[in-house]
Amino acid sequence: MFDKLLPKPIDNTYSGSKIALWLFGLIVFVHILQSVMVIVNGHSIAQSADGIPLENYPAAAAQTILAIFTVSALRRLIISLICAVALFRYRSAVPLMFVVLGLNYLGGQVIFQFIPIIRVGTPPGVVVNLIMFGLTIVGLALSLWRR
């Protein structure tokens, strides 16, 4: 199993389930779309998808929140683009990239336990990200499964 997570040659050889590749493609596409939407229209996305009440903060604080939010989206976009490269060119790294995506989500959730985000209502972004994490776990298991 560890040989599949950390393959000696990183090439286009892939022995996991084909369904895992489709799941990986879907997850990467959604992450890229989410990231670009935040970078292009962060104010609206922060309020609607993530339920962050920006109007409750002074203008300078809201701008700082948006800047941090957008930088986080840029980092997520970079990770997602690396995942896309793995999907199309270095498929032996797909299981490792599933782990990277999963740890990225889990790390964020741990941080939010100590520094919670104040949200209004039940924003859809939280649910979408939880579903994407579930698909990531399923995809990881399928990518490690020998055909």
Please report, for each region that a protein language model flagged, where it lies by residue.
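Membrane-water interface at the C-terminal end of transmembrane alpha helices
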Residues: G134-R147
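N-terminal signal-anchor transmembrane alpha helix
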Residues: S15-S44
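Membrane-helix interface motif
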Residues: I39-S48, V99-N104, F114
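Juxtamembrane helix-break-helix junctions at the cytosolic face
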Residues: S80-P95
